[in-house]
Amino acid sequence: MAAKEVKFGDSGRKKMLAGVNVLADAVKATLGPKGRNVIIEKSFGAPLITKDGVSVAKEIELKDRFENMGAQLVKDVASRANDDAGDGTTTATVLAQAIVNEGLKAVAAGMNPMDLKRGIDKATIAIVAELKKLSKPCTDTKAIAQVGTISANSDHSIGDIIAEAMEKVTKDGVITVEEGSGLENELSVVEGMQFDRGYLSPYFINKPDTMVAELDSPLLLLVDKKISNIREMLPVLEAVAKAGRPLLIVAEDVEGEALATLVVNNMRGIVKVAAVKAPGFGDRRKAMLQDIAVLTGGTVISEEVGLSLETTTLEHLGNAKRVILNKENTTIIDGAGVKTDIDSRISQIRQQIGDTSSDYDKEKLQERLAKLSGGVAVIKVGAGSEVEMKEKKARVEDALHATRAAVEEGVVPGGGVALVRSLQAIEGLKGDNADQDVGIALLRRAVEAPLRQIVANSGDEPSVVVDKVKQGSGNFGYNAASGEYGDMIEMGILDPAKVTRSALQAASSIASLMITTEAMIADVPEDKPAGGGMPDMGGMGGMGGMM
């Protein structure tokens, strides 16, 4: 086991504070509409230029191990805020730095760290409750566009395209961000339910010019097993042929004789048919088949529920207005499912999203929810170079997270004003003793830090602006982009309440733990021997007689 170095008390805390300040100073330069860029060296390719706080934080590793511990803890603050609300990483970092700096001064002055922590916790709970009171619902497209614009560093084109995407696919829809090929941002929306499985045979194609198979007003046969024997399908195929409607088969697989017979029937025009593999694997496949069944008003043919292909009738089949299959995807448009059944399925999936702790499962459930409720929108980011593309894509993703958070918990005045206004919640707040009162006062000063930093980055005097904002009330604040004072909501400067809340909670949680640190343990760096020289060759002297 490697030897350890231990630092106690003030000497350890000073090192930790130095690390906190290095990381926070790099990150906070990006805050606000006039935040600066940070350039990050990459091991290959061009350096990365970014104004994204979490991208800056992720890159920082310090040589001194004790300083690095402080930096990594603040990095954790940024990650927590990002995981919870998808944005607010820079605000969380600025708050954490302010709380740690103020807190460690109080500890050095002889205050009890545990009481300071209790005071900070008490004040945080009161401010979070006040933020919830200050928040206004965010439902209209204009407000959503404003939130997206602010989060994307005042880029109106990003805010507008996100608002348009949300309007088209609803708040439950999936919006994905991809790299585009042009200079402008583009939005494409997939209507209906799409899943990533294409036709099983190119012989199903009936539109050779676009290489797709299109079925108008089809019936859907949903089967939870492999189909290889055509005989078991004959009754249902005959019934479909009599009905004179096309048929889409969605099964675990269709192979061998069954696939060949379907192709022949399709080419001869006996039954217009197409077959596709069911999306997903294992239990997820069963769930997605059930989703398609609910959406189209059909029944999944599964031995688990006592149904077999031989006994399948037209009543078991789903209905849709149209189905389009290409090589990679299948889209079901306007399924004939009962609305109450679809709503019930949606609420069931929402419940599962709330219950699961796995990010992967959550993402897959969110996709299923979107396919049932809204649809899928793809934002293609346009840029003039690869470096600009990476930077812009990160901003679009941030803005997308921020708008989702705004729809979820509402919006508050932006530009650090909401935190300053929420101070009224702790005006008369008292702790159980004098040290807890210091903890409350400490947080009162710290929550001004984001506003101060936004003003500093815009080149103005922080103290003057903070005093003027404090003298105002309601939504009155400072627009750093234009240098004007006024109503932040009317000026379109909004922050999602969830982002502000998550930033404060993450910052006060980690910062108060750092204040109560008494010992720090790190590995002692090993002295590696200088390489390059050959080992001692002294034993070669006896070779002289070989001449």
From Swiss-Prot:
**Where does this protein chiefly localize?**
cytoplasm
Where would you find this protein in the cell? Answer: Cytoplasm
Instruction: Give one GO biological process term.
Output: protein refolding
Which residues are noted in the entry as ATP-binding?
30-33, 51, 87-91, 415, 479-481, 495
Enzyme class per UniProt: isomerase
Q: Which InterPro entries match?
A: Chaperonin_Cpn60_CS (IPR018370), Cpn60/GroEL (IPR001844), Cpn60/GroEL/TCP-1 (IPR002423), GroEL-like_apical_dom_sf (IPR027409), GROEL-like_equatorial_sf (IPR027413), TCP-1-like_intermed_sf (IPR027410)
Catalytic reaction equation(s): ATP + H2O + a folded polypeptide = ADP + phosphate + an unfolded polypeptide
Q: What's the short name of a Pfam family annotated to this entry?
A: Cpn60_TCP1
Superkingdom assignment: Bacteria
Can you provide one Gene Ontology molecular function annotated for this UniProt record? unfolded protein binding
Q: Which UniProt keywords apply?
A: ATP-binding, Chaperone, Cytoplasm, Isomerase, Nucleotide-binding
**Keyword ATP-binding among UniProt keywords:** yes
Which CDD domains has this protein been placed in?
Answer: GroEL (cd03344)
Q: Which PROSITE patterns does the UniProt record give? A: CHAPERONINS_CPN60
Cellular component terms per the entry's GO annotation: cytoplasm
EC number in record: 5.6.1.7
Q: What quaternary structure, including any partners, is listed in this protein's UniProt entry?
A: Forms a cylinder of 14 subunits composed of two heptameric rings stacked back-to-back. Interacts with the co-chaperonin GroES.
**Similarity comment text for this entry:** Belongs to the chaperonin (HSP60) family.
Q: What does this protein do?
A: Together with its co-chaperonin GroES, plays an essential role in assisting protein folding. The GroEL-GroES system forms a nano-cage that allows encapsulation of the non-native substrate proteins and provides a physical environment optimized to promote and accelerate protein folding.
Q: Quote the protein name from its UniProt record.
A: Chaperonin GroEL
In which organism is this protein found?
A: Pseudomonas savastanoi pv. phaseolicola (strain 1448A / Race 6)
What does the organism's lineage look like at the top?
A: Bacteria, Pseudomonadati, Pseudomonadota, Gammaproteobacteria, Pseudomonadales
